C-alpha cells in the first residue's frame, strides 16, 4: 500500500514550459482567476516506520488539504493537478535537499508550494508497575518536516522550514499492541485517539503554512 509514495518521486519529467514536440511531457495548468495565493500542497512523503494498515500519506495529505480549504484563505490546486505534476518529478529531486532550483519548473503557475515529510510515527509503551508494559497505555510520538517555497521570483525561495513534533496519549485499549486501533476510513476514526492525534498534527501544520504564506504575500 505504501509503494506509490516512493514512485511519485521516482518518475521523470522536465517541466521547462510548453513544447510542441511529440515527446513533450509538460503539464499544462490553467491559470486560476483568483486574488488568493495559488498554492500546491504536495503529497506527504512518508519516511517513518509506522505499522499502520492504511496509507498514512494519503490520510495526512487529505487532512491538511481539508483544513486549508476550511480556512479559505488560499487557492489550492486540485488533487488531480497536483498528482499530474508530482508524479513526473525527476528521479532524485528532493524538496528537502540543498538543490531546489527545479521546484519552480516542477510546479508552474504556482505562487507557493508546500512539502511535507513524515519522519517519525512511533507508539512507545508507557512504563508502569506492570511486568509487561505493552499491556498498558502508550505515547504516540509524531514528527513532520514542512518546507514552503515562494515561487513568485526568478528562483524558489524558502519561506518556512521547520519540524513540528507532537506527543499524544493513547489509552491501553486503543494501542497497536491491543489490535484495537480504529482504521482511517472508519466512521469512528475521527473521534479515536489516533484520529484526534493526526487531526491536531495536521491542524498545526495547516495553520503554520497558511500563516507564513499570507505573511509573505503582505511583504
Q: What are the functions of these language-model segments?
A:
Residues 1-8:
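Bacterial N-terminal signal peptides that target proteins for export
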Residues 8-16:
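Bacterial N-terminal signal peptides
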Residues 12, 33, 106-110:
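Alpha-helix termination/capping residues and helix-transition junctions
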Residues 18-35, 123, 136, 141-219:
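C-terminal/domain-edge helix-coil "capping" segments
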Residues 27-49:
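Post-signal peptide N-terminal segment of mature Sec-exported envelope proteins
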Residues 38, 47-120, 147-161, 204, ...:
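N-terminal segment of the mature soluble domain
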Residues 123-129:
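Extracytoplasmic/secreted cell-surface and envelope-processing proteins
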Residues 130-134:
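Extracellular loop and loop/strand-boundary signature of outer-membrane beta-barrel proteins
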